[in-house]
Every structure is written in structure tokens, then in C-alpha cells.
Amino acid sequence: MRWLFWASDNDKDGCKCNSKSSSSSDEKPTAPLKSNKDWNSLSNAINWSHYAEPSNLIPTVLLTSGILFAFRIHRRYLRRIPEATNISPSYLRQRSILGKVTSVGDGDNFRIYHTPGGMLAGWGWLRKVPTSKKELKNNTIHIRIAGVDAPELAHFGRPSQPFGEEAHKWLINRLTGRRIRAYVYRPDQYSRIVATVYAYRFLFFPQDIGLQMLREGLATVYEAKSGAEFGGPEQEKKYRDAEALAKKKGKGLWKTKGSNDWESPRDFKSRMNAIDQGKDSST
């Protein structure tokens, strides 16, 4: 509406100011907008080309590659395997295990403490193999020698087989405290790992333990309907030839081959199993 003529200019100005102040008080204050220029200005301020210079890039790449390479080497070659059940399937028929013999169970099996890397990794001069039963518990790999069957010792109420003690003593003298290399093939039903075993009598002259036992007449070639393991046809032929020669010479357990009570280790175990089954059925 039009202002009355007697209204002064000061009143008009006051009204205008009041209306403006009231309207401005009703409006909500707006927060200042964040400028996305902050990050851009920061990133632009960094001299990224400095990191692409060969003097900085090459050492970084070399250091990263070295760390990754060292990790791979440790994981593949220097990581210790505590027990036979911890052996990765990728090892079987592909890799060998180096270790020190801690005990011999009977004529064809024993335990080793895995020493990955051998002397180059410090075993024997910087790192010691434990000797106490407490330290060795759950820390040794149980190995079954592949391709051979030694005469049985007395155990589980069963009698000892002829030449069982001789085979056991021979293996103790040949292996206890020695470094061996085992070419692993597969686990057996007793949580052992079946392997061809080489013992180091001298630094560069490994000896095939299974083959030597056959030559001495202290074991026969492993005979079973299933589960026989030699590591290949060539190895099997070598073992059978050694057994045939020992048999021909009448060495070890072959001395009494012509007698009526002669039994191979396989026949002895089969007879003992039949006796045990007969006892179970009678009870």
C-alpha cells in the first residue's frame, strides 16, 4: 500500500531495515562449501616425477624383488618340516628331504630331524639338532625305506624273525647320527613317508641304503599285492638284481634258504597276521 503523506523518510527506512533483518533471521545459516581444489592443489604440489627418476625407482624395485625372492626361497627350500604328516603333496616324487637320523626303529624304518639347506644353512655349526626326547617329540619325520622288507623284530607279542636283530643293528650302525637324503614318494598307512634313502659316509659319496641291505642279504625286495614302491622301473630292476646276487652267494638271511622253516619277511608277517586273526575269532 502507499505510505501516508505524513510518514517520514526515516520511518520508511526503519521499516525496510526491520523487514530485512526479520527475513534474514528466519533463514538458516549455510555451511561454507568445501572446495575440491584442496586435494588437487596438494597433489599438484608434490613432485611425482621425482619418484620416477632411475636413481629412486631402480633401488625400490630391487629391494622389493629381493624381499619377495628371499621369502620364496625360505618357503620352498629353508622351511623345516616337523613330521611326515606335514609334508606337502607337492614334494612327493618331486623333491628330496635332507636330515639327520635321530633313531632307528627296526630294520627298514627310522626317524630324521629335517635340516633344510644342510650345512649351507648353518646346520651343524650355527644351528644344532636337538638330542633330548622332549625336544624331538613331534619334531621328527618317520621314514620307511622304499623297495625293501627287512626281517621283523619282536614286538606286539610277536617273536623275532631270524636275522631281524642283525638287520636292525646294521641299520643303527649305518645311520644313527648320519646325514641322509630321502627322495620321498608317498605316505603309508602308519603315517610314515616311503622314500629311497641315501646316507653320506663321505661328503660326496652317498650310498643307497636299501640297495646295500639287499646286497648284504639283510632284506628282501618288498613283495605285496599293492603298495610296493621303488621309485621307478630302473630302481626296481637294480634292487631285484642285487637280491638275486645275494641269494646266489647265500648272504645273510639267504644262508638258510633251503631249510623247511625258512620264511621271507612277507611270509612271516602273513603267518603272524593269520595267527592273530585266529586268536580273535576264537575269543
From Swiss-Prot:
It is an enzyme of class 3 (hydrolase). Residues 10-36, 250-283 are annotated as: Disordered. Gene3D superfamilies: 2.40.50.90. Residues 95-256 form the TNase-like domain. One of its GO terms (cellular component) is membrane. InterPro entries: SNase_OB-fold_sf, Staphylococal_nuclease_OB-fold. It is a single-pass membrane protein. Its EC number is 3.1.-.-. Its main location: mitochondrion. The keyword tRNA-binding does not apply. One of its GO terms (molecular function) is metal ion binding. Residues 258-270 have a biased composition (Basic and acidic residues). The chain crosses the membrane at residues 57-73. Keywords: Calcium, Endonuclease, Hydrolase, Membrane, Metal-binding, Mitochondrion, Nuclease, Transmembrane, Transmembrane helix. The active site is at R144, E152, R192. Pfam families: SNase (PF00565). Belongs to the LCL3 family. This is Probable endonuclease LCL3. It comes from Arthroderma gypseum (strain ATCC MYA-4604 / CBS 118893). The gene is LCL3.
